[in-house]
């Protein structure tokens, strides 16, 4: 009988939720929901130097914003933060010490650095050399007594089986194998401050919480043999491991870096700019996984139903900001008006543009939006000075029929009554200019659009003219003549 599926996302509260960590959480979430398993949030907060105030709250809030829920977490369960589990770690440290599978190490940082320097100078791969090698029992006891008398606080190191082979069948990458002799020697499982190291604590946590599958980024592959050593030393069965490929920048082909200014990499950024969470969820789900076929827009429920861990990609996932923005635009275009207006409203309010025309403006530009904050630059025309024309726009306005078109259309607007000035009545006036002048197509529409809005492209022209107002539209046309 197979074990119940229990997976976890275990962030460190050391900053904002990065797109890579969000993907780890999302794939674990999809896997659990697809197979009727349990999705657990555990906080790995033992790195006190990097601890960020409010880091945990920020992580959880952004996961909730994306649309994820979980079954167990620090919000509902005790001891789901590593800092609350120190007694448990100590119990297993003491067990390994008593069994001779671990030992206290008194070597100092200065001695380690000097040895590393010597090894590098000799062209050797840096590794820890057991400080007790060649010592008799009496010499060892004397060494320890002298070190303790000098106030040196020991670490605890796991005794590595140098001839051991540590292998697993990875859910993504297939068979992977490491030799114990290539790990770097006996490694620290408890630091001088009494806190466990990551590779020790995570094993105790995963065993204690009965985690069945560990799905994470492939930057953790090198951690896995160390974790398998701890499972072996404690006599526990290891979970299955799956290591997702790196996320790379689609433009540079290199690993996604926080210095890549052409990408939005933190979930907080998407929230602040007014993206729909459903769009971000959909986009992240396709970073390193796809269900097959050409379709790319999926609801959360569809993604859960389609998720198949066997389709996790073995190739790096390309993060393409343009693709993200295309997908976001698809979601905003097809969302109901109330949803989009609610996203745009805070931006309009902050800019002092929450006027009686606000709803009409959102409706006008809804098909163009990639994020709600774009409503401000898109509506500048209605609240700011006429924009400076680009060279391409100036070239259009230098056309020989432009003056004829603008004079004729200005006359049509001037002849319209206030009662008749509505979007549905403006388009017939443009067609009337076409009939009178014989000018049509781009030579007709483009000069009017540029004269009124200062742009070659935009929403429906009659709607733009209506919301701008007759007087302002006429004023803009006059300025072009």
Swiss-Prot record:
Keywords: Aminoacyl-tRNA synthetase, ATP-binding, Cytoplasm, Ligase, Nucleotide-binding, Protein biosynthesis
E.C. number: 6.1.1.17
Short sequence motif named 'KMSKS' region, residue ranges: 255-259
Coiled coil: none
EC class name: ligase
GO cellular component terms given for this protein: cytosol
Gene Ontology biological process: glutamyl-tRNA aminoacylation
Primary location: cytoplasm
Subcellular localization: Cytoplasm
Keyword Metal-binding: no
Keyword flag Nucleotide-binding: yes
Disulfide topology: none
Annotated GO MF terms: ATP binding; glutamate-tRNA ligase activity; tRNA binding; zinc ion binding
UniProt motif 'HIGH' region: location: 11-21
NCBIfam families, per database record: gltX_bact
PANTHER family: GLUTAMATE--TRNA LIGASE, GLUTAMATE--TRNA LIGASE, MITOCHONDRIAL-RELATED
Function of the molecule: Catalyzes the attachment of glutamate to tRNA(Glu) in a two-step reaction: glutamate is first activated by ATP to form Glu-AMP and then transferred to the acceptor end of tRNA(Glu).
UniProt-recorded name of the protein: Glutamate--tRNA ligase
Species, as recorded: Streptococcus pyogenes serotype M1
